[in-house]
């Protein structure tokens, strides 16, 4: 089974259980803690992915690291994942959980790239217009690309709306050449 499929199944099961048990906010908070630790500890991720580290040892490692920061329900999930030899997928499971949660809540990530940093007012106006355009809540991820000269490029899912001056000049150049 591919890692994406397995990750999505575990994430979906965790999301369903958290919703049914009415402890979704707790799980979301605890997953943020776990993700933060995993992002800052490459050795932990290697240990969880290593076939040389036995499942019981992985459970013990997870318990030692997270005993003061996650609840019993999350420990049950972590034990299950380790017991099923999927502890190495924890980063992917957490990412898939966030994707599923965002889909359920109607939130989308939007990459906004500009030549210079947008002001708070410009960002708010752009986010408002994008929310009206998509019908969803927008989570903006801002970036700066100095090669743009000016303008903004917006990436929503797989679609890019490029309103940068450099892109417009490139399109003008193509039309003049052909």
Curated annotation (Swiss-Prot):
Gene Ontology MF term list: proton-transporting ATP synthase activity, rotational mechanism
The keyword Transport appears for this protein: yes
Domain of life: Bacteria
Alphabetized UniProt keyword annotations: ATP synthesis, Cell inner membrane, Cell membrane, CF(1), Hydrogen ion transport, Ion transport, Membrane, Transport
Cited InterPro entries: ATP_synth_OSCP/delta_N_sf, ATPase_OSCP/dsu
Family matches, as Pfam families: OSCP
Subcellular locations according to the entry: Cell inner membrane
Any one of the GO CC terms: plasma membrane
Bilayer topology: Peripheral membrane protein
Record's function text: F(1)F(0) ATP synthase produces ATP from ADP in the presence of a proton or sodium gradient. F-type ATPases consist of two structural domains, F(1) containing the extramembraneous catalytic core and F(0) containing the membrane proton channel, linked together by a central stalk and a peripheral stalk. During catalysis, ATP synthesis in the catalytic domain of F(1) is coupled via a rotary mechanism of the central stalk subunits to proton translocation. This protein is part of the stalk that links CF(0) to CF(1). It either transmits conformational changes from CF(0) to CF(1) or is implicated in proton conduction.
Subunit and interaction comment: F-type ATPases have 2 components, F(1) - the catalytic core - and F(0) - the membrane proton channel. F(1) has five subunits: alpha(3), beta(3), gamma(1), delta(1), epsilon(1). F(0) has three main subunits: a(1), b(2) and c(10-14). The alpha and beta chains form an alternating ring which encloses part of the gamma chain. F(1) is attached to F(0) by a central stalk formed by the gamma and epsilon chains, while a peripheral stalk is formed by the delta and b chains.
Family according to the record: Belongs to the ATPase delta chain family.
Protein name: ATP synthase subunit delta
Source organism (scientific name): Pelodictyon phaeoclathratiforme (strain DSM 5477 / BU-1)
